[in-house]
Amino acid sequence: MAINVSTNVSAMTAQRYLNNAADGTQKSMERLSSGYKINSARDDAAGLQISNRLTSQSRGLDMAVRNANDGISIAQTAEGAMNETTNILQRMRDLSLQSANGSNSSSERQAIQEEVSALNDELNRIAETTSFGGNKLLNGSFGNKSFQIGADSGEAVMLSMSDMRSDTKAMGGKSYVATNGKAPDWSVTNATDLTLSYTDKQGEAREVTINAKAGDDLEEVATYINGQNGDIKASVGDEGKLQLFAANQKVSSDVTIGGGLGTEIGFAAGKDVTVKDINVTTVGGSQEAVALIDGALKAVDSQRASLGAFQNRFGHAISNLDNINENVNASRSRIKDTDYARETTQMTKSQILQQASTSVLAQAKQSPSAALSLLG
């Protein structure tokens, strides 16, 4: 090997390996201190893109879980308020049955009516004041709202809430009252058939036909009607008037009353009534109130069932989102996170090489001095 002083190739080689070892040590320290093996695009351009997409998906899933939990909280708030609405309606029903009893005087019925009116006011207060995050839930203003329960746009679920005030259509129905009352000794004679034609809530045409027997009184006619169907309730009110009630939760059309017996009794046109209109100061009003409240309870129960299903659905959605998020983060970790066992081994190797290169470089720098000995 030639000896020269102008170019020290050995030192240059040692310097190059020393720089490589120093870079390796620096890179290992960066990865160990940051916890990531990809800290810039030069580390792994493709891996950086994939990990960033997975990070976006993971953050979207985290927000989706939060949104779903907010949706559950809203449903729980509304369902809790409707539970109290149910309790109020049950109490109003009890009072209506109490008022329908013949042992009550007019003053006693008036006292019962005062409590019914107070309960009605509280029912409306609950509907008007129940809110979540500034949004009213039960006064009809909530409408339909979407809940984003996915990591990407378009992955939303709709929630709707009905108006739970006592004057809404869902909390009422139509009342049909005979135009003329029957005397206490009235009974069925020749005309024995009565038909009720209507469309139910599912949109199917229905017809109920009863065939009374000669000698049956008005109470027995009402019993026949109630026994033949579950949609229209019959009762006998004041002054011997047969009255029918069709809840909007069960019947979606007007009720057409026909047949010979129906014509003989004679009914006025249907009148829209709601829980707000309950009047238990009369026997007829008390009887009608029971049927009316039964329809209102069905409306509340239907909404509560919908909210229960909504909560269960979101509970399953959260479980699925958590599972997806776990797998996404595991994939991102494999791509981006530092393997400390491997990296500490690599850093130790780089440090040893750095020390060796430093020693070799020091020796290589002494090579040109050999030329001096040749000069004597």
Curated annotation (Swiss-Prot):
Pfam families in the record: Flagellin_C, Flagellin_IN, Flagellin_N
GO cellular component: bacterial-type flagellum; extracellular region
Taxonomic superkingdom: Bacteria
Coiled-coil regions listed in the entry: 103-130
One MF term in the entry's GO annotations: structural molecule activity
The keyword ATP-binding is annotated on this UniProt entry: no
Keyword annotations of the record: Bacterial flagellum, Coiled coil, Secreted
Family the UniProt entry places it in: Belongs to the bacterial flagellin family.
Function: Flagellin is the subunit protein which polymerizes to form the filaments of bacterial flagella. FlaB is not essential for flagellar synthesis and motility.
Official protein name in the record: Flagellin B
Species whose genome carries this gene: Vibrio anguillarum
UniProt lineage: Bacteria, Pseudomonadati, Pseudomonadota, Gammaproteobacteria, Vibrionales
